[in-house]
A protein has these predicted regions:
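Extracytoplasmic/periplasmic solute-binding protein
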Residues: 146-159, 164, 185-235, 278
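Glycine-centered hinge/linker elements that transmit conformational signals in sensory
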Residues: 191-193, 234-262
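C-terminal capping/gating helix-and-loop segments adjacent to ligand/active sites or protein-protein/ligand interfaces
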Residues: 380-433
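Hinge/lid segment of periplasmic solute-binding proteins
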Residues: 108-163, 216, 301-303, 373
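A structural signal for short loop-to-beta-strand junctions that line the ligand-binding cleft
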Residues: 100-102, 132-171, 312-316, 391-399
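Extracytoplasmic "Venus flytrap"/periplasmic binding protein-like
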Residues: 64-139, 175-182, 272, 276-280, ...
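Extracytoplasmic/periplasmic substrate-recognition and gating elements
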Residues: 176, 247, 251-257, 268, ...
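Short, low-complexity disordered leader/linker segments with a strong preference
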Residues: 1-46, 68, 435-446
């Protein structure tokens, strides 16, 4: 195994640059000022959709309803492709802030970057003084708080989240007289019994290509029951219980899964599941529409990953939470906040999440008909609302999180699947990089 690379210089440089942008923007005068104003509460505001295209239609519906309620406010809608949104925000900040929107879609994956550059207003007090107080799912609120890197303030209003889901073929389970995979014992038993390699039938399919580590983390923490990503200043990723869970997970490869899983990204994995004889798939709610379209509602079910053992609290790895941010440079924060509050209201939040197939953040949407008719979404919502559920907050606030958890280590994960690297060596390598990144981040907070 190659020596672990310390990421200190690159991480420090990244964060230092972000802090420099923040100081530069704050020092600006009226031209590009980031202080903004409350404004008249009417007139025109600009909204950047952080997934323009797929979500354009639903946002235009919500904007039309908002403008009907507030005829003195006009919303200028700007669709930003999801692949460009972070760079679009960064460019606007670096140019002084004048071109930033009043309101923007903000995901937790890049929230800390915007906070570090001083681009967003905190919204904690605004939530507390509005109809949203006490109406947002607590676990989503905590995910947003953790992702922003500030223990006290929220820098976006959560609107939706995804969640890891264990999808299974109810028709195959029924034919084999197997119980639902609602425990790890049932899961591993079904994976074995539904596999017939000679007949090209498999109990499970996993993700070995792009995005593989995120799904491995889901499986590790769900099985280990470890409820925090950090133990002091060190990650729990390399805890022996997580290493053991990873060993069980990778042992499935080629034993009960197709060999092609080695290079699966999510699209290949989902297509393989929907078009073959595969019993189970671990993905998220986003693939529900594909499953229904290709398999039919009577052949598919989805449940949250099982708790580590019977009677234990469920441990869920945090998924990125989408939200709406109030930009500090806005000259009409009063009108911008009206739009955020309206979009996050029970009716609008429900409408938006029904369209995109995600979990609504507003608890007032929980009893809506569409959720009752979508059992996987209902189960995910109930698990997030369960006070016993423990959400393992991933460190999206680390500048190098995406590098460490994706491209830099995905080739090493493939080596684990192929038996060329042990699960322990992999966990140790990633943990060392995360510990160094956390130490750098903390150093720059003081």
């Amino acid at each position: 195994m190659k020596p672990t690379r310390r990421r200190t210089p690159r991480t420090a440089t990244t964060l230092a640059a972000a802090l420099t942008f923040a100081l530069t923007a704050t020092a600006c005068g009226d031209n590009g000022s980031t202080t903004g104003e409350e404004g008249p509460g009417k007139g025109t505001i600009t909204f950047w959709d952080n997934n323009g295209g797929p979500r354009t239609k639903i946002w235009k519906q919500i904007i039309a309803k908002f403008e009907d309620k507030y005829p003195d406010i006009t919303v200028k809608y700007v669709p930003i492709p999801i692949t460009n949104v972070q760079s679009k925000y960064d460019t606007a900040i670096q140019s002084g802030g004048d071109s930033l929107p009043d309101v923007g879609g903000v995901g937790t994956a890049y929230l800390a970057n915007l906070v570090a550059q001083g681009a967003l207003d905190p919204v904690t007090d605004r939530i507390d003084d509005s109809a949203l107080k006490g109406k947002l799912i607590k676990n989503m609120v905590e995910s947003v708080r953790a992702a922003g890197g500030d223990d006290k303030e929220l820098y976006s209003v959560p609107t939706s989240a995804n969640q890891g889901t264990l999808w299974y073929r109810t028709d195959l389970f029924k034919a084999a007289k197997l119980p639902a995979p609602d425990s790890w014992e049932n899961f591993y038993k079904a994976a074995d019994e539904l596999t017939d390699r000679g007949g090209n039938k498999f109990g499970f399919t996993l993700r070995g290509g792009a995005g593989s580590i995120a799904q491995a983390l889901d499986m590790m923490y769900a099985q280990s029951g470890i409820s925090s990503f950090w133990d002091g200043d060190r990650t729990t990723l390399d805890d022996p219980r997580n290493v053991a869970a990873l060993e069980k997970y990778i042992a499935l490869f080629k034993k009960v899964t197709p060999a092609a899983d080695l290079n699966n990204d999510f699209a290949k994995m989902v297509a393989q599941f929907d078009q073959g004889d595969i019993g189970m798939l671990q993905h998220n709610l986003g693939s529900y529409v594909d499953h229904i379209r290709l398999l039919g509602k009577d052949k598919i079910a989805g449940i949250p990953l099982p708790p580590s053992r019977a009677g234990a609290a469920r441990t869920i790895v945090s998924n990125p939470v989408d939200g709406l941010g109030l930009f500090k440079a806005s000259k009409n924060k009063a009108a911008a906040w009206k739009f955020i509050e309206f979009a996050a209201s029970p009716e609008m939040n429900s409408l938006w999440n029904e369209d995109v197939g995600a979990i609504p953040a507003n608890v007032g949407a929980a009893d809506d008909d569409w959720i009752a008719k979508a059992p996987p979404t209902r189960a995910a919502l109930e698990s997030l609302n369960d006070p016993r559920t423990k959400v393992v907050q991933l460190p999206y606030y680390l500048p190098d999180w995406n590098n460490i958890s994706k491209a830099d280590n995905e080739p090493s994960f493939q080596k684990v699947l192929l038996g060329r690297l042990t699960a322990k060596a992999f966990c140790d390598k990633v943990a060392n990089e995360l510990n160094a990144a956390q130490a750098d981040w903390k150093k720059h907070q003081n």
